[in-house]
């Protein structure tokens, strides 16, 4: 049986921010190609700041816990500040939003947290496109594959 830490179990049993946002400024969906988990993310953005974030899911405990933590941590964040620095710095900043809270994730489940960050970038890219911020939108889209690459490098170190 897969052993999960108490933080992951807690977020799975009582996930935060589950639901939809009516008329979201940003929305994205992802189907994890590794396991089939699905996450949909909705963002309410005002003056370039994430005011609210909610998600719907069909997935395992780690997928749910990742989205629960991420939607809590992303609130109040200024979008432009999230993208300051090199691609590696931006990826690390976004990954840290869940990693620091969830603790150790079983190696067999390391494919779950990247999906949450990827769906966030997809949601933000949609918002930035509507706002006419094409350069920042392109950067958000270009970071999506780098999230999984980041996690794969971590797996190789173990």
Kindly give the residue locations of the regions a language model identified.
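Structured beta-strand/loop patches that form or line metal/cofactor-binding pockets in enzymes
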Residues: 10, 18-47, 54
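Glycine/charged-rich beta-loop-alpha catalytic/anionic-binding loops adjacent to active sites
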Residues: 44-55, 93-102
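Alpha-helical support elements that line or immediately flank enzyme active sites
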Residues: 62-80
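C-terminal binding/interaction regions
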Residues: 1-22, 28, 77-80, 84-158
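Short, thiol/selenol-centered motifs that function as redox-active sites or metal-ligating centers
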Residues: 35, 57-66
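Helix-adjacent hinge/juxtasegments
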Residues: 43, 51-53, 70-72, 81
């Amino acid at each position: 049986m897969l052993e999960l830490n108490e933080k992951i179990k807690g977020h799975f049993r009582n996930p935060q921010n589950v639901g939809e946002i009516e008329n979201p400024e940003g929305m994205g969906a992802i189907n994890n190609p590794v396991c089939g988990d699905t996450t949909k993310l909705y963002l309410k953005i005002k003056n370039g700041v994430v005011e609210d974030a909610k998600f719907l899911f069909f997935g395992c405990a780690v997928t749910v816990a990742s989205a629960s933590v991420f939607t809590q941590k992303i609130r109040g964040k200024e979008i432009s500040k999230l993208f300051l620095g090199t691609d590696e710095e931006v990826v690390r900043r976004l990954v840290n939003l869940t990693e620091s809270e969830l603790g150790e994730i079983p190696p067999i489940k390391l494919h779950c947290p990247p999906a949450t960050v990827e769906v966030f970038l997809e949601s933000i890219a949609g918002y930035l496109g509507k706002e006419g911020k094409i350069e920042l939108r392109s950067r958000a889209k270009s970071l999506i594959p780098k999230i999984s690459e980041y996690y794969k490098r971590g797996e190789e170190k173990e």
